[in-house]
Every structure is written in C-alpha cells, then in structure tokens.
C-alpha cells in the first residue's frame, strides 16, 4: 500500500506515526518473549552487545527450550556473566514459566540475596509486565532472598553450605561458588603474594 504523505493532514500524519510506533513496540515485545538477547536489549537500554553475548544468549535459549540440561560459563570478570546468568536469566525464566521454581546459589548468602533483590525488582517493573502480561510478584514478596510470583513460581537464594533440604528447582543457577579470600597466596615470578597485594598488569602462574 502506498501513501502520499504530502496529501495527508498533520493530524493524519501524527496518527500514522503513532500506529507505526505501536507496531514496532509490539514486534519488540514479541521478540523479547521469544529470545533471551532481545529481552536483554529491551529491558537494559544501556546494554552494549559484545561478540560473546550472542553465544551466551543462544546457550540460555537452548536451556529454556529443553535442548540442553546444563551449561558452564567461564569468562573473565566484567564480561556481564553475572548480569546475564544471575539477574536477567532468572527474570526471563519466570516471565516464560511463572509457575516454576528457581534456586540461586553463590559463595555467600549475601551475594545470592543481592542477586535475588535485583531479579525481584526486575520482575516487578512495569516494562517487564509489558513483555509478560499478567506476570507479577505475589503480594507478600518482601524478602529479597525468597519470594514468589503471582502464578505460584518461587525464587530462593542461598550461599554455599546453606541448608537446601527439601528444596527443589526447575532452574538452578550457581554463580561463583568459590571465592578467594583475603590472604590467599597467589604464585608470581617473585614468589607467593597475597591476593590483595597483586599489582595490576603483573604476572601470575596458573
């Protein structure tokens, strides 16, 4: 269909522009429901995509679509591993499967609960409900480390060594289960050096 824009009134142009924006937004929502990376881009406006992000997103989509049962991701710090795996993935999972259960484990309960707070806040956002209509937090979801959706789904955060007896999960996320404590000796060309004394740009032996 061809439109002669020059023959349209200003009001008609405004209306057409509105309809096009609504169509584009509807496409964006549908894309975000279907794929993890489009969900990231919609929910995280400042996200800058790197070459590795598509690979991680494909792996997560495989897990959610039942093509993989488990994956292990090893990356250097500051490559958005935790943001992807421990914040956006659980939120996306509960958007698609709001009646399922998630367990988030980290080396300390404080870290795990911190992730839980961010996931909870993400699920409670209005733009999340735009992508997944009808999915929201349950009315009593106050605790950051243990909360539920309004569809019966549950989120539980725990530190390594915490009690998990009787707990089950449809999605288990383990982020940094081992952390090097202060004072941990690291081998370097000059001998063993405490981890907190390592210099930026120095060499270590792995």
Question: What is the role of each PLM region?
Answer:
Residues 1-69:
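N-terminal accessory segments
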Residues 57-61, 83-95:
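Contiguous, well-ordered alpha-helical segments that form the cores/surfaces of helical PPI scaffolds
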Residues 68-88:
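Walker A/P-loop
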Residues 82, 162-169:
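SF2 helicase motor core recognition
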Residues 92-101, 124:
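Post-Walker A helix-loop "phosphate-sensing" segment adjacent to the P-loop in P-loop NTPases
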Residues 105-161:
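Conserved nucleotide-state-sensing and coupling region of NTP-binding domains
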Residues 171-179:
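Signature of the SF2 helicase/ATPase Hel1-core->accessory helical subdomain module
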Residues 179-206:
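HINT superfamily self-processing domains
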